[in-house]
């Protein structure tokens, strides 16, 4: 299937490959985009379109998209979102605090973050994911004349997940009610006893230890455990191992994100596009089971669009959101001589950039790493290694890098 734009750049109904080849051969159209393949007409034509519904399966790690008519699916995509932003923000915060710790005479800055006081402010990690949702919807509107959007969002009762029998005022009476802080609660919960040696070390000094690092696990009580000073130091020195029974509790990061983005995404989408509707996960699941469809993000999106019986496209587009630019000038480690290694790579290496789409020995892949000598680590978007040190002389540039890398994939066989 080939997507078509009119002479003014507005989307029309897609056509078959043979029709597109004929138009290109007769110089009645030009290539507008290679992935997904799109042509633009060079003559004035009637702008006849059909009703197309876009189903959006919103998520915290993946987005499913499917544009359908009643008879046929016209577009299907699975978008992988970035999940490294929280770690990067934590690393940046750690570096910033380390720098300021060397200047103790400087007046501390801790209460002048005015952005968080503004109405509608979102954390950078959440904001970036929501912006990606808007971008992929906008990109499809540039390819197809979408007339209706249906979005599946989800709301999670985290307190109900923790305690199925909770009701009424118990929602305001959480597990930390009556305690000054999290540390006091964790010590009380663990009966002021080391959870590693159970008090055998006779060490009276107790520490609250993060099971997973604070950077990735957070400060929630289910990520904290009581350890004595002896076990705590021994664990960090590598001489003590925690019992296998000590595990981090259930994480609700994804559920929290969906609760934040639910109304924010839907309400703003209604301001941009005219016909936007909301559906829910239980409706999608019921539709998928009734039509005996496998579970996948783009298949859920087809069910969300209201046309589960539409003829499948036969393939789908896998997209991955990549980092656009690393603004860190130096590495953190100090080299011999008190110097810091530069963190900025060359803008171009032999005419190629990071995440450029290239062809190598008949295979389409992406540049994942580069060397100034002109050798590249090339892979598929799923991380499959094609060659760890391919010469630039053997590479053919297909597309320059974009914030959303895209590759076409065949549908998996139905079992």
Predicted regions and their residues:
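Short cysteine-rich loop/turn motifs with clustered Cys
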Residues: 142-148, 179-207, 228-231, 353, ...
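Glycine- and charge-enriched low-complexity intrinsically disordered segments
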Residues: 56-58, 380-415
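Charged, flexible boundary elements
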Residues: 15-47, 175
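Short beta-strand-centered aromatic/proline hotspots
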Residues: 356-357, 363-379
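Short, flexible, mixed-charge glycine/proline-rich loop motifs
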Residues: 45-47, 178, 182-190, 218-222, ...
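Gly/Thr-rich phosphate-binding beta-strand-loop-beta motif of the actin/hexokinase/Hsp70
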Residues: 50-69
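Substrate-contacting helices/loops that form the catalytic groove of nucleic-acid
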Residues: 47, 68-177, 243-351, 397-414
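Histidine-centered nuclease catalytic patch
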Residues: 195-226, 237-242
């Amino acid at each position: 299937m080939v997507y078509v734009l009119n002479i003014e750049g507005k989307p029309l109904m897609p056509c078959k490959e043979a029709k597109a080849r004929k138009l290109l051969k007769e110089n009645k159209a030009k290539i507008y985009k290679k992935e997904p393949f799109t042509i633009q007409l060079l003559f004035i034509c009637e702008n006849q379109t059909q009703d197309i519904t876009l189903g959006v399966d919103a998520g915290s790690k993946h987005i499913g998209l499917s544009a359908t008519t009643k008879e046929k699916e016209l577009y299907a995509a699975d978008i992988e979102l970035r999940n490294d932003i929280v770690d990067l923000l934590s690393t940046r915060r750690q570096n910033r605090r380390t720098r300021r710790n060397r200047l103790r005479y400087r007046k501390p800055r801790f209460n002048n973050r005015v952005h968080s006081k503004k109405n509608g402010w979102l954390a950078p990690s959440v904001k970036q994911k929501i912006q990606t949702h808007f971008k992929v919807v906008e990109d499809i509107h540039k390819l197809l004349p979408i007339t209706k959007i249906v979005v599946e969002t989800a709301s999670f009762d985290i307190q109900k997940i923790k305690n199925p029998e909770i009701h009424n005022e118990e929602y305001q009476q959480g597990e930390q009610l009556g305690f000054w802080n999290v540390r006091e609660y964790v010590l009380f919960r663990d009966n002021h006893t080391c959870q590693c040696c159970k008090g055998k070390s006779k060490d009276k000094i107790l520490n609250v230890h993060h099971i997973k690092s604070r950077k990735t696990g957070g400060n929630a009580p289910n990520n904290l455990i009581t350890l004595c000073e002896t076990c705590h130091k021994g664990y960090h020195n590598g001489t003590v191992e925690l019992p296998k029974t000590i595990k981090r509790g259930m994480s609700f990061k994804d559920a929290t994100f969906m609760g934040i983005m639910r109304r924010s995404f839907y309400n703003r989408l209604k301001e941009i596009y005219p016909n936007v509707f909301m559906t829910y996960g239980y409706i999608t699941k019921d539709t998928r089971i009734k039509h005996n469809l496998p579970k996948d993000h783009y298949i859920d999106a087809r069910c969300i669009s209201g046309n589960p019986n539409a003829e499948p496209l036969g393939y789908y587009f896998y997209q991955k959101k990549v980092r656009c630019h690393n603004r860190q000038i130096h590495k953190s480690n100090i080299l011999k001589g008190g110097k810091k290694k530069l963190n900025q790579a060359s803008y171009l290496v032999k005419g190629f950039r990071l995440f450029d789409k290239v062809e190598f020995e008949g295979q389409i892949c992406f540049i994942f790493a580069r060397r100034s000598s002109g050798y590249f680590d090339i892979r598929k978007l799923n991380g499959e290694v094609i060659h760890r040190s391919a010469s630039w002389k053997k590479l053919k540039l297909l597309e320059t890098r974009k914030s959303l890398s895209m590759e076409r994939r065949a549908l998996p066989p139905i079992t």
